[in-house]
């Protein structure tokens, strides 16, 4: 029973955090997480708005060794296992842009290395529990991915709705301006023609 409780608890204890940041033009924002050797860390990101929806991404380890580097990416997902204890850094850079800020939504998921479930007496039971726990972890990761994708879709839907509303308002304003100009030109032509014929009559 203790083993079952331990395994089911894995589904709810996987640390994960979601963030929404704004990276100004020619700026780089970095974040840090302290990991132990063997810990898995997953980074999923998407550029919600700004320019061509691209951002530079970089992940470095405690030894300043580059683990991942991507340039001008609009979205992505990368998972790695910590090769040593220490602070791992992941940065989002917008240095390629001189004017446009970028809005980035990203999620960090940290999975601790496998530990034997308490109360596992025999090796076979321990192996079965480890396999079941790994399956639960994979299910948990899949559910988290679905949740994050839904969050990304909500953000993108909101951004596109704002763009559409802004575009519609501009179209309405431009149509009103064109109508005003058309009415003005029509009235001007009427007065011009009226004056022209009045002059012809006097002659």
Swiss-Prot record:
N-terminal signal peptide: 1-18
Family: Belongs to the EMP24/GP25L family.
Entry keyword annotation includes Phosphoprotein: no
Major subcellular location class: membrane
Membrane topology summary: Single-pass type I membrane protein
Classification via Pfam families: EMP24_GP25L
Keyword Transmembrane helix appears in the UniProt entry: yes
Domain GOLD: 28-110
GO cellular component: COPI-coated vesicle membrane; COPII-coated ER to Golgi transport vesicle; endoplasmic reticulum; endoplasmic reticulum-Golgi intermediate compartment; ER to Golgi transport vesicle membrane; Golgi apparatus; Golgi membrane
Coiled-coil stretches: none
PROSITE patterns named in the record: GOLD
Compartments where found: Cytoplasmic vesicle membrane; Cytoplasmic vesicle, COPI-coated vesicle membrane; Golgi apparatus membrane
Protein name per Swiss-Prot or TrEMBL: Suppressor/enhancer of lin-12 protein 9
Transmembrane segments: 171-191
């Amino acid at each position: 029973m203790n083993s079952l409780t331990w395994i089911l608890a894995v589904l709810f204890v996987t640390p994960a955090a979601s963030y929404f940041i704004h990276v100004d033009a020619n700026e780089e924002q970095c974040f840090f997480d302290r990991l132990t050797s063997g810990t898995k860390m997953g980074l999923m990101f998407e550029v919600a708005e700004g320019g061509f929806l691209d951002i530079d991404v970089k992940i470095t380890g405690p030894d300043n060794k580059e683990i991942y580097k991507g340039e001008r990416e609009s979205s992505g997902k990368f998972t790695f296992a910590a090769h040593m204890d220490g602070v791992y850094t992941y940065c989002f850079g917008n240095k390629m842009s001189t004017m446009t800020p970028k809005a980035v939504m990203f999620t960090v998921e940290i999975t601790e290395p496998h530990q034997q479930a308490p109360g596992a007496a025999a090796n076979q039971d321990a192996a079965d529990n480890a396999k079941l726990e790994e399956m639960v972890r994979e299910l948990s990761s899949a559910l988290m991915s679905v949740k994050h994708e839904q969050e990304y879709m909500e953000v993108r839907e909101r951004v596109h709705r704002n763009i559409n509303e802004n575009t519609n308002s501009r179209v309405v304003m431009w149509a009103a301006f064109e109508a005003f100009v058309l009415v003005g030109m029509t009235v001007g032509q009427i007065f011009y023609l009226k004056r022209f014929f009045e002059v012809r009559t006097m002659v």
